């Protein structure tokens, strides 16, 4: 078996030995978190599989030791591969497939997608099963040393470009920076768009995919995105750019630029339009692209006069990214047009569709006079093999570009200060929120078709909150395997629209809506933490008692109840600590209640009864979820005691729904239950971890169990101190 050794020249090479010498194993390497990569020519390697598959280009290989500190959300990357499930061909290596934004690896900035992991601390993971690699990473502790291999990036050509600002400014857009990586694992500032007619376009040397190293004398390597924005804004008419030109071979391993960039033109270009991305909800930033994304074909190489104008028949096979194009139009019979082709997607790979095509039909469904929604539904429901009749109509499409530009201006004008030409910098970039309402983008009258639908309780990572109406955000998944990125309505937009709705609803009444604005809920800021106990369970709403009883009887090893306290005398058959904790005096229990040692307490027949924090903690630390029959007020008291509960509200859809779920109660009882639930939701929505609904108790109970499973931890989201 080939093994990894280290010789005195600080080069790694493979030798024909069964095991590496002990003195050269990774455990005995110097613990230098920032040690430079070690370079070795591929002619010293005897493992062609690595030479062909790892990140970079053929030629030289580099090895790097990267030390990461495990964060609240883990190490912040995903892996694939292993002897039982090779990621590329027959190569058993463990590959990095994703760098999670905001995670430990992304913040460190050195680990890259397609890096091959050789060792985790002292554990050799070069030829192990996938589960063994996962276990090695899980058991590595809080400080993890990774030994990775990649191809050495090709040498970049460095040039200096002199630009003179014109009416359209510098005329290009950028993305990237520390904490806002354009390419996972790379903090560089990249050019993502050249604006036609701008200074960069007229000069002709700056291209999409170029890396900006410096502006005048200001370096842009390893800087925040906002710093790059400021450096480009604070320039005079003559600007000198230091630019690195990447090679095509390296670009093939890169990732497509995100849809939202910062534009340096007096006419903002923020890729916000009334269009539908007809693929998955993944952003283009997370989709592998072909080199042509960074090397756009010049228009004069394929003149518009060479493109046929008659209707064409195109067959596209839906891929994992959907069909891979956006559409606009559908108002007043104006037609449906393609506005964007996703690089590397099915439409792009077919080579048959282009921006400016009008879609006449989909699988025989006539779309010539269809609305935008009708066209989107037709394309979504078209199946795996989609037959499209399209006709190239650039003149008609140009009308949409003008309309889109006007919409952008209207949106941006609401969030830009006078005299500025770029998105206003906002200090609240990169924070996490929990949604306190359901949002269905199809019911929003706004024009952002790339909006992101979500449900109550979903955690969202806000990537960019610089616009006052729409925030760019990523839905956070517990498995960190997939990302849904899009636009969500800002807190201001949500609350303004809800306030307008309430005002319209109460218009003409004597009391009006005075004082209701404070009750409008949108989002709450959250932070992630690790817990080492089983979270208490509080179920609220109709049928909560039945759900509690079923959990205790069906899963006695996972759920338990705590022993309450009381001041009443112990009866002969009762045992202290089993039936109740009998408190010796009323004064003592009252003092403990005032000291917030109880999450809930009350009086019955002149005796005090209550549930103490310590009783709940004892059950939780035994690894059982403590089922609590308490009011919603107990949620905040448990949070204050650092025992963060899972609070589930069973929301009845209607009075009839209450009767259907519980057929044993009368209509009057159902009405009271429905009214109590309505009031409970109005007063305590922000305390709920999740809201469940159902047409039967069985459906509700199934959803309750799933919520508990999803929110059990060990990593959970809790309210943060910061306010939006």
UniProtKB/Swiss-Prot annotation:
* Tissues showing expression: Expressed in the outer plexiform layer of the retina of the eye (at protein level). Highly expressed in CA1 stratum oriens and stratum radiatum hippocampal neurons. Expressed in the striatum and in the cortex.
Q: Where is this region: Disordered?
A: 15-35
Per the record, the coiled-coil ranges are: none
**Residue intervals of the PDZ domain:** 65-151, 160-246, 313-393
Its main localization is membrane
Read off the Pfam families from this record: Guanylate_kin (PF00625), MAGUK_N_PEST (PF10608), PDZ (PF00595), PDZ_assoc (PF10600), SH3_1 (PF00018)
Signal peptide positions on this chain: none
Guanylate kinase-like domain boundaries: 534-709
Q: Which PROSITE patterns match?
A: GUANYLATE_KINASE_1, GUANYLATE_KINASE_2, PDZ, SH3
Q: Lipid (S-palmitoyl cysteine) attached at which positions? A: 3, 5
According to the record, what happens upon gene knockout? Mice with a stop codon in the third PDZ domain have impaired spatial learning. NMDA-mediated synaptic plasticity is lost even though receptor levels and localization are unchanged. Long-term potentiation of synaptic transmission is enhanced due to minimal long-term depression.
Residues in SH3 domain copies: 428-498
A single Gene Ontology MF term assigned here is:
beta-1 adrenergic receptor binding
Changes after translation: Palmitoylated. Palmitoylation is required for targeting to postsynaptic density, plasma membrane and synapses. Palmitoylation by ZDHHC2 occurs when the synaptic activity decreases and induces DLG4 synaptic clustering. Palmitoylation by ZDHHC15 regulates trafficking to the postsynaptic density and function in synaptogenesis. Palmitoylation may play a role in glutamate receptor GRIA1 synapse clustering. Depalmitoylated by ABHD17A and ABHD17B and to a lesser extent by ABHD17C, ABHD12, ABHD13, LYPLA1 and LYPLA2.
Instruction: Kindly list the places in or outside the cell where this protein is found, as annotated in its UniProt entry.
Output: Cell membrane; Postsynaptic density; Synapse; Cytoplasm
What are the annotated GO cellular component locations?
AMPA glutamate receptor complex; cell junction; cell periphery; cerebellar mossy fiber; cortical cytoskeleton; cytoplasm; dendrite; dendrite cytoplasm
What does the UniProt function comment say about this protein?
Answer: Postsynaptic scaffolding protein that plays a critical role in synaptogenesis and synaptic plasticity by providing a platform for the postsynaptic clustering of crucial synaptic proteins. Interacts with the cytoplasmic tail of NMDA receptor subunits and shaker-type potassium channels. Required for synaptic plasticity associated with NMDA receptor signaling. Overexpression or depletion of DLG4 changes the ratio of excitatory to inhibitory synapses in hippocampal neurons. May reduce the amplitude of ASIC3 acid-evoked currents by retaining the channel intracellularly.
Assembly and oligomerization: Interacts through its PDZ domains with ANO2 and NETO1. Interacts with KCNJ4. Interacts through its first two PDZ domains with GRIN2A, GRIN2B, GRIN2C, GRIN2D. Interacts with ERBB4. Interacts with KCNA1, KCNA2, KCNA3 and KCNA4. Interacts with SYNGAP1. Interacts with ASIC3. Interacts with CXADR. Interacts with KCND2. Interacts with SEMA4C. Interacts with LRRC4 and LRRC4B. Interacts through its first PDZ domain with GRIK2 and CRIPT. Interacts through its second PDZ domain with the PDZ domain of NOS1 or the C-terminus of CAPON.
| Domain notes from UniProt | The PDZ domain 3 mediates interaction with ADR1B. The L27 domain near the N-terminus of isoform 2 is required for HGS/HRS-dependent targeting to postsynaptic density.
Q: What is this protein called?
A: Disks large homolog 4
